[in-house]
């Protein structure tokens, strides 16, 4: 996920350019001083020396530590790349920008596949975006600054003698190059589509590479640097009603909702993800939908610029590098015709079941070292096969009981990280830019989950004094709990109110029965840990309780609930779910899978709250029980 650091962090990481000839300055912040010192670490290195050992610290992951397998997790996030190769690419796009200056005004050219195995979006590679240098001078990288180490990418700021800064995004090698290739190709094309067709402000992408055979020696995206502040700076989800910051609160809801409105404004012709049409030259034509991505395009430069291909939604690719891509994955990735929206759910279930079966087979063959109980994997198979089985019946796609059902089923663009953390407000013009389209896909609005920053599944409280009996007589601790529920309810209500203002035909997607019907699929999409298959089961069992009512109201396809659960199945589920909740409560940092921000980790380690074990793992010291 892209994060442009908040004011103070990014500025601390960036200093003036080096004046040494042939040298660049690499800047990173010491892990132990990230939030204490304003002085970054500086390393000077010769541009031509790709093997300079002093550079290694610049590429190491430093923003957090793990309680288990810390060394291995950090090695997975080592992002060494060729600075010399980056410099060559910058010179190449500078030459392309001068050539593009001769192109007719308003002409939108297709991406150019370069001989060095990179791709240039020449439509963006123009002098006003790239900058200028003196004749006979070459582009020179002067300063590299590590400004963010995110969940999926390392983000570097690249300063040059063009008087322009760029952003270099390097994905962590957590998955194989095939996965990264699809992900990058689709993300770049989707941002291009959002910019040129939907009118959404995004950082302009200049060049990208999908594997390590290019001069950078890593998959990468080189894009525009946006100077500004994250919209998250203004978001306070627990703000008091009528606060002096109410305008900021309202503006955050409005800005994010306006982006969503643009994303879903155009009905598309298939479900999957967006790619450039000329990706067909190197790929299998059967991967792509032959018909136009949308109807009615009159601009010849945009006709056939994009196609719908396999979905890159994260849940379909996560932890599946061990699968045979062509035999075990590709059949479940789409694209899917717009007449078959529920195939998305069905294929999600079938793919996850296939993944669990393969992991069991590998474990039985002794070819897998992962520490996973076979029972958990077997339970996952049952859960995901149930999800696939119920998929065709979850929604009656011809029902009249849900207003505007066909609008809700139409393919529309979905941004999986629509969040104030992914919106940066330009410093000069105060314009909002939407970042990080990784994992974007086209799916029906009825299957799109709410943004995480306002999502709330707990008890709804709309008015504290009306909904809570004798609220004023409660203890302060009880009042705080109810106030928390009220504010979370309010946030979600304000979001849905803005959705109704912007897209009234889509508002029934947030009706409680519709939310419940899609909840098993959403639980599958949002699953983070092995045990969270239990949340899918929980959603399915909740549906079982109300299925008859939904059938009577023509919301579902079958009168009888399609799945069979024995009394023993339900009792075992209740017991396992209780154990999961107890684990989340009792296990420190379970919600982040044992990851701890580095400043907090250092404080806990120095205070003795975290203790290092002989095997390199860490344990959290439990406080002694009081007598």
From Swiss-Prot:
Q: Which SUPFAM superfamilies match?
A: Protein kinase-like (PK-like)
Q: Does this entry carry the keyword Mitochondrion?
A: yes
- Its main localization is mitochondrion
Q: Where is the transit peptide?
A: 1-43
Output the superkingdom of the source species: Eukaryota
Keywords of this protein's UniProt record, alphabetized? Mitochondrion, Transit peptide
Keyword Transmembrane helix in record:
no
Spell out the subcellular localization from the entry: Mitochondrion
Cited InterPro entries: Kinase-like_dom_sf, Mito_inheritance_9
Q: Which GO terms describe its cellular component?
A: mitochondrion
**Which family, according to UniProt?**
Belongs to the AIM9 family.
Q: What is this protein called?
A: Altered inheritance of mitochondria protein 9, mitochondrial
Origin species: Saccharomyces cerevisiae (strain Lalvin EC1118 / Prise de mousse) (Baker's yeast)
């Amino acid at each position: 996920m892209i994060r442009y650091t908040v004011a103070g962090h990014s500025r601390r990481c960036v200093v003036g350019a080096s004046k040494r000839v042939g040298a660049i300055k690499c800047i990173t912040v010491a892990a132990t001083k990230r939030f204490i010192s304003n002085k970054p670490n500086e390393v000077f290195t010769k541009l031509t020396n790709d093997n300079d050992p002093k550079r290694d610290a610049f590429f190491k992951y430093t923003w957090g530590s793990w309680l288990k397998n810390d060394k291995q997790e950090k090695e997975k996030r080592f992002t060494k790349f060729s600075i010399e190769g980056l410099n060559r690419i910058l010179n190449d796009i500078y030459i392309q920008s001068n050539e593009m200056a001769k192109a007719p005004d308003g002409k939108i050219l297709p991406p150019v596949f370069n001989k060095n195995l990179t791709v240039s979006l020449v439509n963006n590679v123009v002098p006003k975006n790239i900058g200028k240098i003196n004749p006979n001078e070459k582009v020179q990288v002067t300063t590299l600054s590590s400004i963010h180490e995110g969940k999926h990418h390392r983000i570097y700021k690249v300063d040059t003698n063009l008087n322009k800064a760029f952003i270099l995004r390097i994905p962590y090698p957590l998955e194989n190059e095939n996965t990264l290739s699809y992900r990058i190709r689709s993300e770049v094309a989707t941002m291009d589509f959002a910019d040129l067709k939907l009118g959404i402000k995004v950082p302009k992408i200049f060049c990208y590479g999908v594997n390590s055979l290019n001069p950078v020696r890593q998959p990468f995206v080189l894009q525009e640097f946006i100077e500004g502040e994250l919209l998250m700076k203004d978001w306070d989800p627990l703000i008091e009603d009528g606060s002096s910051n109410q305008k900021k609160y309202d503006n955050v809801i409005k800005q994010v909702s306006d982006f969503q409105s643009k994303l879903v404004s155009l009905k598309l012709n298939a479900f999957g993800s967006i790619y450039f049409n000329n990706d067909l030259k190197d790929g299998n034509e059967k991967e792509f939908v032959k018909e136009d991505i949308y109807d009615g395009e009159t601009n010849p430069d945009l006709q056939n610029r994009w196609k719908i291909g396999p979905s890159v939604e994260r849940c379909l690719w996560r932890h599946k590098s061990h699968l045979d891509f062509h035999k075990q994955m590709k059949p479940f990735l789409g694209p899917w015709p717009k007449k078959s929206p529920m195939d998305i759910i069905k294929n999600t279930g079938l793919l996850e079941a296939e993944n669990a079966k393969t992991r069991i087979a590998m474990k039985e063959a002794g070819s897998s070292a992962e520490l996973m109980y076979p029972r958990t994997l077997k339970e996952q198979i049952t859960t995901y096969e149930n999800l696939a089985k119920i998929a065709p019946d979850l929604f009656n796609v011809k029902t009249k009981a849900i207003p505007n059902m066909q609008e809700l089923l139409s393919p529309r663009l979905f941004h999986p990280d629509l969040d104030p953390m992914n919106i940066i407000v330009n410093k000069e013009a105060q314009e909002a830019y939407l970042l990080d389209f990784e994992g974007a896909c086209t799916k029906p609005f009825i299957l799109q989950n709410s943004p995480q920053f306002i999502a709330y599944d707990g008890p709804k409280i709309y008015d504290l004094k009306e909904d809570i009996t004798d609220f004023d007589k409660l203890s302060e601790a009880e009042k705080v709990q109810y106030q928390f529920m009220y504010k979370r309810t309010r946030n979600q209500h304000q979001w849905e109110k803005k959705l109704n203002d912007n897209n009234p035909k889509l508002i029934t997607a947030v009706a409680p029965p519709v939310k419940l019907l899609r909840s098993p699929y959403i639980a599958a999409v949002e699953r983070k840990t092995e045990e969270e298959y239990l949340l899918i089961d929980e959603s399915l069992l909740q549906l079982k309780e109300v299925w008859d009512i939904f059938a009577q109201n023509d919301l579902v396809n079958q009168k009888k609930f399609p799945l069979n659960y024995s009394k023993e199945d339900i009792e075992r589920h209740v017991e396992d779910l209780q154990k999961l909740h107890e684990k989340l409560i009792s296990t420190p940092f379970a919600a982040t899978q044992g990851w701890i921000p580095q400043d907090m980790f250092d404080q806990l380690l120095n205070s003795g709250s975290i203790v290092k074990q002989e095997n390199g793992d860490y344990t959290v010291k439990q406080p002694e029980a009081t007598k």
